[in-house]
Each structure stands twice: as structure tokens, then as C-alpha cells.
């Protein structure tokens, strides 16, 4: 069984800033969300947790699994997509001239520029991670948890459910919510 969770809230989430690989910590609400998720999902018998090395995801996993004997294993391939020089940009949804606008509004026409990562690069690294780490565990009937980020999580969900790129954002997971894939 595979479960996926998005990290708790950060100040940049609340300010509608692109986080990407910028290492932003959870804010007080994000900490509370992760603690509440720990209670809500305490009955799920996770065997292992893979997590992005970024602080907001690591802290979410630590709070979620506090007091449980579940290994938390960071993997660089679970980092959020890089938005390059556009990280920190506010309200990209209101700026069609910004190259990152299509990332959210029209994924099939998104072109990575200025140090940003492409969808192809994102799918390549998360696909490799799935094949190398997750699929063998699922074949052994293990219960696997991934704690990550919006786009990174969606790339895994899209791959496993066969969702085309134009529908990439239909599976968005709210902060600290858990889905079963």
C-alpha cells in the first residue's frame, strides 16, 4: 500500500510564494497540522517513510510519525521541483508573462527557463525513485509513506494512475492530507 502526504504549511504557502527547492520551515500552523495528522492517521501501520530532504517535509514526517518505530529515509529525488530564479515569486497565477505561469495553468506548454526544472526532469527522477525504492517494497506487501511536495507528489500520482500532463494538477493534495495511491 502506498500513501502520499504533502508537507504542512509554511509562511511562503500563506504568502503565495513559489517555494521549489528553497528550504522554508513549517510555520506554527504547519506544525499544528502535522501534529493533528499524527492523531488522525495513527492507525495506519506504515513500514517505512521516504521523505524529501527539505526541512518542511522532514519536519512534517517527524511530527507525523513521532513515537512510532518507522524509519524516515530522506531521498534527494523527492525534493520539490526547482523554479530556478523564480523561487520566492508571489502570486504567479496573476502574471501570465511569468514563465512559471504555464507550469500551473497549462502544463503541456510549460518550458523550463532560468534554472527551473522541466516536467520531464521531474518525472525522470521520481520515476527512478519509484522503480528503485517503492515498487520492490510494494511487491513485498509493505505499507509505504512518502512525505513530499505539491508538484513532486503529483508526478508520482500521475505516473501511477496514468494521468496525462494536461490534467497534472487535478490530483493536488492539500497540506498535511494523506492519499492512498
Protein language model features and the residues they cover:
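Phosphate-handling substructures
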Residues: 67-125
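Short beta-strand scaffold positions
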Residues: 51-52, 124, 147-148
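Domain-level recognition of soluble alpha/beta enzyme cores
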Residues: 161-181
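Active-site-proximal alpha-helix that buttresses catalytic centers in soluble enzyme cores
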Residues: 9-68
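Extreme N-terminal starter segment of soluble prokaryotic enzymes
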Residues: 1-3, 48
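Short active-site segment of divalent metal-dependent hydrolases/proteases
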Residues: 10, 152-153
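Glycine-rich phosphate-binding loop signature in dinucleotide/nucleotide-binding domains
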Residues: 42-45, 133-142
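Generic beta-sheet signal
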Residues: 2, 142-150
